[in-house]
Each structure stands twice: as structure tokens, then as C-alpha cells.
Amino acid sequence: MTKQTEYKRKPEWLKIKLNTNENYTGLKKMMRSKNLHTVCEEAKCPNIHECWAVRKTATFMILGAVCTRACRFCAVKTGLPTELDLQEPERVADSVVQMGLKHVVITAVARDDLKDGGAAVFAETVRAVRRKNPFTSIEVLPSDMGGVEENLKMLMDAKPDILNHNIETVRRLSNRVRARAKYDRSLEFLRRAKEMQPDIPTKSSIMVGLGETREDLIEAMDDLRANNVDILTLGQYLQPSKKHLPVLKYYPPAEFAELKEIALSKGFSHCEAGPLVRSSYHADEQVRSAKEKTAEAK
């Protein structure tokens, strides 16, 4: 039995209860009516039913639904992106009002076809949400925007409450998992964000189950802390289709608990770790925890 077939069957702890109550169906209709996209749907997130039906939260995906990159773990469509929709920021802001969100996550496809990587629309979306929802905390989850400092500055000047950028995997596997992104470029992106706005918490996420070792994960944690990242999320990689990378290991909940303890011992202010954890999972709790610890440190 090979590693690839050994883990083909999902373990019990990955089975989730589907809840499609009126909150879920209502949010889905609203997204379609406003021509908005969510990473919850596009990336086939396993928590969509909990977030939409129970917590009534969602992660908006701006700049279209087509990504210029083709990372081997991701279910988002790739190809030639659509034209920029300059009305999108206002529609996102209106949706946040309609949903009554206390915390919103704004992410985007990679737009390597744009000189600014989509930074201007990203920043305007933050400002639009802030104008119409002054008490809503805002988390942004951008691509590396080509590693261009001016693009990052444009986004950070909009003053989101938290900057999230995912390294996705460990250094050893990075080129295979996300060939058009660079591990060290992502670390530099996170470091520069903290240098530009020291009071804004930074965050990153790692998927497990792609062939990494415990030592690889500890190295990645150390790399993130060396670049002043505050929050870490750890979750199980799930293969979106047979065309994507296979799952080489399903981590049990107990192992996630061990990894969380290691992460906290490294100095992360908050770590969310579990089989179904994704970057935006319980994001409102993460930002609250990080801000409380930042205040305590002053």
C-alpha cells in the first residue's frame, strides 16, 4: 500500500454536519444578487455550513473569480481574469451592512496581470467597509502582490485591523505546492507589513498533510516568528479534485493539539489548529485575542 492510497479514505474526525438553514440559503442568494464571490464557495471550504448557517459570517473574494496562478492545492479557477469591477468595494460594504457582521475577511485571487496586483481595489474595499461599518473589524488576506513594496504600502495605508498572508506550506515543499509564489517572498511580505504598521497584527496559515515532517513545521514556525508574525493557523489539507496534490497524511486532533502547544511556546499570540481549521476560521476570535495581547504588552 502506497502513501497515496493509504490515506484515501477520510477519517471520522473530518466528517462534518451539513446545515443549510435559512441563514445559509439567504446569504447564498444575497451573494448571487450582488454578483459577489466568497472564498468559502470558490475554494470549497469545509466550514462553509458552520460559518454561513450558524455563525453567519463569510470571507469575501474580490478582484474576480479567476486567478492568474495555478497552485496545486487550490480549487479556485485559473486563467485570464476578468476586467476590474470598480463598483465591487461598495457592494462588499453594503453586504457587510446587510449581514450585520462584526468582523469581515476580505481576500482576493492573485492578479499578476495588474501592475499593482489589485492593491488599489483592495485598499478601496477596506475604506468602503470602514465608512459604512465603522464598528466592524476588517481582516485582509492578499496574495504577495508580486512582492512590490509600494503595493503592500497602498494596502497597509488603508489600515485594516489584521493583515493575513499565507505561506501555505513548509519551505521544503513550497516550490512544488505553489510554484509561482516564493516562500521567502511571503516571509518578506509579512515582515514589511509589520514594519509599516507595527500595531496591526499579522497572521499566516499552514496546511498539513502534503508530506511535511514535524521538523519542517517547526522550521516554518520559527521563520514566521523571526518575521514578527503574531497569529498562526494550522489545518488539514484536503484534495479538491484528482487533479490536485494528493493527501499524504491525515493528522488526528491530538497531533494538532501538540502543534498548537509548540506554536504558542514559540511566541505566537494566538494559534488556531485543527483538522477543519482554515485561515479565516473563527477569525473574529483570533483578531480579538491578538489585540488583547498587544495591549497587555504595552
From Swiss-Prot:
Gene Ontology cellular component terms for the protein in this record: cytoplasm
Binding site for [4Fe-4S] cluster 2: C67, C71, C74
Catalytic activity: [[Fe-S] cluster scaffold protein carrying a second [4Fe-4S](2+) cluster] + N(6)-octanoyl-L-lysyl-[protein] + 2 oxidized [2Fe-2S]-[ferredoxin] + 2 S-adenosyl-L-methionine + 4 H(+) = [[Fe-S] cluster scaffold protein] + N(6)-[(R)-dihydrolipoyl]-L-lysyl-[protein] + 4 Fe(3+) + 2 hydrogen sulfide + 2 5'-deoxyadenosine + 2 L-methionine + 2 reduced [2Fe-2S]-[ferredoxin]
Cofactor requirements of the protein: [4Fe-4S] cluster
The enzyme's E.C. designation: 2.8.1.8
Keyword field contains S-adenosyl-L-methionine: yes
Residues binding [4Fe-4S] cluster 1, per UniProt: C40, C45, C51, S280
Pathway given in the UniProt record: Protein modification; protein lipoylation via endogenous pathway; protein N(6)-(lipoyl)lysine from octanoyl-[acyl-carrier-protein]
Keywords, comma-separated and alphabetical: 4Fe-4S, Cytoplasm, Iron, Iron-sulfur, Metal-binding, S-adenosyl-L-methionine, Transferase
Gene Ontology MF annotations: 4 iron, 4 sulfur cluster binding; lipoate synthase activity; metal ion binding
Comment on bound cofactor: Binds 2 [4Fe-4S] clusters per subunit. One cluster is coordinated with 3 cysteines and an exchangeable S-adenosyl-L-methionine.
Matching CDD domains: Radical_SAM (cd01335)
UniProt domain Radical SAM core: residue ranges: 53-269
Record-annotated membrane-spanning stretches: none
Localization terms from the record: Cytoplasm
Keyword Manganese tagged: no
Family: Belongs to the radical SAM superfamily. Lipoyl synthase family.
Protein name: Lipoyl synthase
